[in-house]
Swiss-Prot record:
Predominant place of localization: membrane
Gene Ontology, cellular component aspect: dendrite; neuronal cell body; plasma membrane
Upper lineage: Eukaryota, Metazoa, Chordata, Craniata, Vertebrata
Name under which the protein is recorded: Metal transporter CNNM1
InterPro entries registered for this protein in UniProt: ACDP, CBS_dom, CBS_dom_sf, CNNM, Ion_transp-like_CBS
Length: 951
């Protein structure tokens, strides 16, 4: 007894020292009487793995479920070492382990029901335990020990693999009726003899059938367990479907469907709206039901499914694998597929119909969960202070419209208008304004003449900003085009007069003002154009308001409809992209029909300035003195539409070619007298520069041609040779004196036009440049105009020649039907020699040799005043022109008239003289039978006697 206690104490010390894991050692021998001395080597046993509830220790009995495999650790104390090798028994039936070896071994034998292996006398029909251990037929086949004992890693312990087979049909019920399964005891072979360990040593194993759970509770049949799992899964799917179908319907959407849906949708929305109105109560009810169903399903599957399975191999790591998470995995998959995916797929497409048909069930569930869910719903309402719903903000509504574009029946323009209206509050003026550099503006000192009004009308704008000075950002007024209704461009009214009269208010906004605010201001009638400004605090100094541009009502409307509005005058589709409008049959307005006629002055000057100009030219400018040109012809010349001109100065492009009146080494044929403004003159190769003002003139040599005689040229020799003619009076003329005419054979005023317009002989090339410095008004007379004026003056001063009476043949009293046009047949060849513009027969008494030397003078582009019309007002619309081919000329040495435009109404010849000369000339010409050559040229005889006229 003392030896056994000492051995037990020694084994306990070794176990405490070696087993650091803290495992509980099941030393059953300490709980029972001392075993026989022969069995002292087996001390106890315990299962290595009890996870999953398949193997457990209850009441000193090892319990295992059928179909499991587990690892068993046994503790023993080896006997004293043998002095000699054991002598084997002669036969296997006399006490050997049954395998032919002498190694220790464990086997299980089945105990009879109710026996428990307590005493051999309790079961008289069976032999005692040690005797049964020797018989292999008594070894249990349902509990199998796999392989021999293996070292357990700790002295005095060993490991052995135990597998419990499936119970045969009917054994589970019999075992269950007797105490919850079949009972097995342990037999141990120590190498010399078999030892039976039963209930006395705590070495019993009870195998329970699968009908019992981990705690030994009786489980229902498999079909009943499957049906319960399906019912719980269906309940979870029901709650999930109701939650998706009811809570996905927003109250706002239900109101929309109730008012604008189909008949079925209106009825369904009406039924659902009452339940959906209590959103938080409904939400708590459905979530509580779904959570309970999912939890019940997980517990049901845990008790119904095996947590793992074992194998038959010798290695635990290969065959004894357990899956305690298998029920959780099956539950998760079932809930995911059956309670989430399927309900969502159906309810997302038919949510309203499902919700309307399940209203009664929903009300029943809400009533059942009322004690718990109603207070919780009220608490949520108090905490959130609004119903749980889907509220669409402006941004969300915009994104909803964009996302629903492929599925909605809205056209693109309607969608753009909706989006533009919703985005109006998010945009500021700076994003849509027209920059100041792109605005059409007028200076406050502008004059509303024809050019300015035409430019305003051509721009197409109805409201035009007016700025003061040279800074465009200094906007002082607004001009409305309708304000020009009573303004005559001929009056040259100052713009400031009109703007001060109407006194339109300026509407200014800041660059960060929202478009909806500006639209409200425009709707109040203040103005449809606003000036955009910002506070400029950059740099040093005080902040100031800086004008950035303008914004109009049209700009805001374009942002609302998200499209450009184009009218007939727009040049760009977008002010920011600068994309030009395609020219699609678009015509620019031509206002030339409203201009002054050619007989009126295009540039208006005061009568005082016209008189001063006339006096200055008649007294100071040599070619226009009364010696060469009469004052009456000079006045007509100044009143010519193209003589007095204006030129605007562009500050942005000061070196523009149109700013030069003369350019060095560029041939010209006109004379210029500056009336208003300033010019800069650059002289010679040295580039000497100086400024000149009003009443300075240039280019006198340009109008002096070979049409003058040698004496005439010598009279104006100081004028003809000046390279730089910049004088206010003839006394200040300087330069070369060209005293001879380039054409010596033609020295009078009737020179040849071929020689007159020869580029090598008659073109004047100045060696100076004249550049304007401001807006100028000047007199510009071309060489042709001056020659026409000379000829008109010469014919005006010539007396009527009596030789012209020779043209009369006694029929002078017969007046023509139209003045200057005789009554001749339409097929008369003389008609082809007449021109309907400004024709007049005049005599040349100074040197005419015969009456046939009559010429017709054409005064090209020279207007005559209405006050000089005398006797021929009723015949002023028709004139007679004689082609140069029909005009007989005299020798080249004689002076002759040029082709000059001369009004018959102001001719110095009398009316009788004109009528007689016209009739005689036509009759004379009609009597000559001359034919044109096939090439349309005159005969050589005619060409030899004619000199072409100036055109």
């Amino acid at each position: 007894m003392a030896a056994a206690a000492a051995a037990a104490a020694a084994v306990g010390v070794r176990l405490r020292d070696c087993c650091s894991r803290g495992a509980v050692l099941l030393l059953f021998f300490s709980l029972s009487p001392r075993p026989p001395a022969a069995a002292a080597w087996l001390l106890g046993l315990r299962p290595e793995d009890t996870a999953g509830g398949r193997v457990s220790l209850e009441g000193g009995t090892l319990r295992a479920a059928e179909g499991t495999s587990f690892l068993l650790r046994v503790y023993f104390q080896p006997g004293p070492p043998a002095t000699a090798a054991p002598v084997p028994s002669p036969t296997l039936n006399s006490g050997e382990n049954g395998t032919g070896d002498w190694a220790p071994r464990l086997v299980f034998i089945e105990e009879p029901p109710g026996g428990g292996g307590v005493a051999p006398s309790a079961v008289p029909t069976r032999p005692p335990g040690p005797q049964r251990c020797r018989e292999q037929s008594d070894w249990a086949s349902d509990v199998e020990v796999l392989g021999p004992l293996r070292p357990g890693g700790v002295a005095g312990s060993a490991l052995v693999q135990v597998r419990v087979r499936e119970l045969r049909k009917g054994e589970a019920e019999r075992g269950g009726a007797g105490g919850g399964g079949k009972l097995f005891s342990l037999c141990a072979w120590d190498g010399r003899a078999w030892h039976h360990h039963g209930a006395a040593g705590g070495f019993l194993l009870r195998v329970r059938p699968r009908l019992y759970g981990p705690g030994g509770d009786l489980l229902p049949p498999a079909w009943l367990r499957a049906l319960g799992a399906l019912l719980l899964l269906a309940l979870s799917a029901l709650f999930s479907g109701l939650r998706l179908s009811l809570l996905s319907l927003d109250p706002v959407e239900l109101r929309v469907l109730r008012n604008s849906g189909s008949a079925a949708e209106q009825e369904q929305a009406r039924r659902v709206q009452a339940v959906r109105g209590r959103g938080t109560h409904l939400l708590c009810t459905l979530l509580l039901g779904q959570a309970g169903a999912n939890a019940a399903l997980a517990g049901w599957l845990y008790t119904s499914l095996p947590p793992g399975f074992g194998g038959t191999g010798e290695d635990y790591s290969e065959e004894g694998i357990h899956f305690p998470w298998l029920p959780a995995l099956v539950c998760t998959g079932a809930v995911f597929l059956g309670a989430e995916i399927c309900p969502y797929s159906v309810c997302s497409r038919h949510g309203l119909a499902i919700a309307s048909h399940s209203v009664c069930l929903t009300r029943l569930l809400m009533a059942a969960a009322f004690p718990v869910c109603y207070p919780l719903g009220r608490l949520l309402d108090w905490a959130l202070r609004q119903e749980i719903s889907t509220f669409y903000t402006r941004e969300k509504l915009l994104e909803t419209l964009r996302a629903a574009d492929p599925y909605s029946d809205l056209v693109k323009e309607e969608l753009n208008i909706i989006q533009g209206a919703l985005e109006l509050r998010t945009k500021v003026v700076e994003e849509v304004l027209t920059p100041l550099g792109d605005c059409f503006m007028l200076r406050s000192d502008a004059v509303l003449d024809f050019a300015t009004v035409s430019e305003i009308l051509r721009s197409g704008y109805t409201r035009i900003p007016v700025y003061e000075g040279d800074q465009r950002h200094n906007i002082v007024d607004i001009l409305f085009v309708k304000d020009l209704a009573f303004v005559d461009p001929d009056d040259c009214t100052p713009l400031l007069t009109v703007t001060r009269f109407y006194n339109r208010p300026l509407h200014c906004v800041f660059n960060d003002t929202r478009l909806d605010t500006v639209l409200e201001e425009f709707k109040k009638g203040k103005s449809h154009l606003a000036i955009v400004q910002r506070v400029n605090n950059e740099g040093e100094g005080d902040p100031f308001y800086e004008v950035m541009g303008i914004v109009t009502l049209e700009d805001i409307i374009e942002e609302i409809i998200k499209s450009e509005i184009l009218d007939e005058t727009d040049l760009y589709t977008d002010n920011r992209k600068k994309q030009r409008v395609p020219q699609r049959e678009r015509k620019r307005h031509d206002f030339s029909l409203f201009k002054l006629s050619d007989t009126e002055m295009r540039v208006k000057i005061s009568p005082q300035l016209l008189l001063a100009t006339h006096r200055f030219m008649a007294t100071e400018v040599e070619p226009f003195k009364s010696l060469y040109l009469s004052e009456k012809i000079l006045l007509r010349l100044l009143k010519h539409p193209n003589v007095i001109q204006e030129l605007k100065f562009d500050e942005k492009n000061k070196k523009a070619p149109e700013h030069y009146l003369y350019q060095r080494n560029r041939p010209v044929d006109y004379f210029v007298l500056l009336l208003q403004g300033k010019v800069e003159v650059e002289v010679g190769k040295e580039g000497l520069r100086f400024e000149n003002g009003a009443f300075t003139y240039y280019g006198v040599p340009a109008i002096m041609t070979t049409a003058c005689s040698d004496n005439d040229v010598r009279k104006v020799g100081s004028l003809a040779g000046s390279s730089v003619f910049l004088n206010r009076s003839p006394s200040r003329c300087s330069g070369l004196n060209r005293s001879e005419s380039p054409n010596r054979e033609r020295s009078d005023f009737g020179g040849s036009n071929t020689q007159l317009y020869s580029s090598s002989n008659n073109l004047y090339m100045p060696d100076y440049s004249v550049h304007i410095l401001s807006d100028v008004q000047f007199v510009k007379i071309t060489r042709q105009q001056y020659q026409n004026a000379l000829t008109a003056c010469h014919m005006d001063s010539s007396p009527q020649s009596p030789d012209m009476e020779a043209f009369t043949d006694g029929d002078s009293t017969k007046a023509p039907t139209t003045r200057g046009t005789p009554q001749t047949p339409k097929d008369d060849p003389a008609i082809t020699l007449l021109n309907n513009r400004n024709s007049l027969p005049c005599s040349r008494s100074d040197g005419l040799r015969s009456p046939s030397e009559v010429v017709y003078l054409r005064m090209e582009e020279l207007a005559f005043t209405q006050e000089e019309m005398t006797d021929f007002e009723e015949h002023s619309t028709q004139q007679l022109t004689l082609s140069p081919a029909a005009v007989p000329t005299r020798a080249a040495s004689d002076s002759e008239c040029c082709n000059i435009n001369l009004d018959t109404e102001t001719s110095p010849c009398s009316s009788d003289f004109e009528e007689n000369v016209g009739k005689k000339l036509l009759r004379t010409l009609s009597g000559q039978k001359r034919k044109r050559s096939p090439e349309g040229e005159r005969t050589s005889e005619d060409n030899s006697n004619l000199t072409p006229l100036i055109t």
